[in-house]
Amino acid sequence: MKIADARAVITGGASGLGLAVARHLTTAGGRVTLLDVQEGPGQAAAASLGGNAAFAKCDVTSEEEVNAAMEAARAGMGSINFLVNCAGVIGAGRVLGKNGPMAGDFFTRVVHINLIGTFLCDKAAAAIMQHNTSGPDGERGVIVHTSSVAAYEGQIGQAAYAATKAGVAGMTLPIARELAMFGIRVCSIAPGIFGTPMLSAMPPEIQDSLGKQVPFPARLGRPEEFAAVVQTIFEVAYLNGECIRLDGAIRMQPK
């Protein structure tokens, strides 16, 4: 499939990697529906992208909201053949912190957003994609997960985050194998240190220090580079069931 033919749902589309993907796709002629729990920023993001973008408010931890948002996206775009899961939270916290052990509710919240939210979006999108007219190789749709290098080298304070991102990477292959019968591919991207709004708010010297930890190129990853890999996954039909590290060869230290 070509990116101009994308009818994409992008979770976490109001900012960061999700917005970068949306901008990349619409610039190439694709259509997108942004899903985000932040209504104001989500509507503003969609408006900034022009007529090929729409917004639907959605909490990815709610199965009812996810199903409704997917149906609204299908109705608005005519079909869905691409899902890019970017919604997530960092969820930094120590198991034994200064104020005592981590609250179970904190860990559960991170799991619900990062892992269960991704799964709920996967199954809702796949239920729609399975009815698409098949293209070359019988393809009907593509799903992309956002994992993280923390899935492989989680740092101190990342127990919840690393667990969820490892779960996202871990379910990629079994879901890809299951959905193969419907002509739906599934891949994950595990980004390293990227220049997202959270990092951009840090002092320049901190950003430079983080960038210098990357072997090559010695800088923060650019959201546009993440978006370019998303396009590659969509267009290269033989990419399936894989988790791609996008990290400049960095291997995270314990802290």
Report residues per predicted region:
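Alpha-helical segment proximal to the catalytic Tyr-Lys
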Residues: 127, 176-178
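Canonical Rossmann dinucleotide-binding motif of NAD(H)/NADP(H)-dependent dehydrogenases/reductases
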Residues: 2-33
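Catalytic Tyr-X3-Lys loop
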Residues: 89, 100-120, 144, 168
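Residue(s) in the substrate-gating loop at a strand-loop-helix junction
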Residues: 148
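Short, small/polar-rich loop/turn modules that mediate ligand/substrate recognition or access, typified
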Residues: 180, 185, 239-242
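Conserved mid-core segment of classical short-chain dehydrogenase/reductases
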Residues: 67, 90-108, 131-137, 157-160, ...
